[in-house]
A protein has these predicted regions:
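Proteolytic processing junctions in secreted/extracellular precursors
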Residues: 2-15
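Catalytic phosphate/metal-binding cores of nucleic-acid and nucleotide-processing enzymes, i.e., regions
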Residues: 13-174
Length: 174
């Protein structure tokens, strides 16, 4: 028989965990693979002035990106804690926001708009704290992590699914 005190304490600790914010591109979905498919060669090899107009022409680019390897496992883990999506949208692509929303609905089965935050990159740091309590950001872009931490949040620089999961477990997520 379970000890009521231990069950109560475990629930109290789990309820007090920081809110998780998870990036999309290169954390959940494979932007670079999709871009290479669209451009015909790796994204960094195409001139900046040429690559974005080509990507923007494809109205379904964002919604048809593939999962990153292992990312379904990461999403399954963080989704147990009602994780939020915090992703930057492309300012010059009117398909970016609706495409990311469709991707989330179709792939992550996420329909709660209150858990989806599609913002300008520099606005991500504004979600670092809630009521003077730090939140967690999982993001592949180190600049975002540094800005997040400077605002008081807990940053997890996403290098692989296993390292991100290990960092979350160190914070008390099971």
């Amino acid at each position: 028989m379970k000890n009521f005190y231990n069950v109560y304490r475990q629930n109290l600790v789990e309820q007090d965990l920081p809110t998780i914010y998870c990036d999309m591109d290169m954390v959940l979905c494979d932007f670079l693979k999709g871009a290479e498919k669209e451009l015909g060669k790796p994204f960094p090899e195409v001139d900046k002035d040429k690559r974005w107009p080509i990507i923007h022409k494809n109205k379904t680019f964002w919604e048809n990106l593939e999962w990153m390897p292992g990312a379904k496992r990461l999403w399954s883990f963080v989704n147990k804690y009602d994780a939020h999506i915090l992703s930057a949208y492309s300012t010059n692509d009117s398909n970016s926001i609706p495409g990311k929303m469709k991707w989330l609905r179709k792939n992550a089965k996420l329909t709660q708009r209150s858990r989806i935050h599609l913002v300008l990159r520099k606005q991500k740091q504004d979600f670092a704290m809630t009521n003077n309590k730090p939140n967690v950001l999982i993001d592949d872009h180190l600049k975002n992590i540094k800005e997040w931490e400077a605002k008081g949040g807990i940053g997890i620089h996403h290098l692989s699914v296993s390292t991100s999961l290990n960092e979350l477990k160190k914070l008390g997520y099971k």
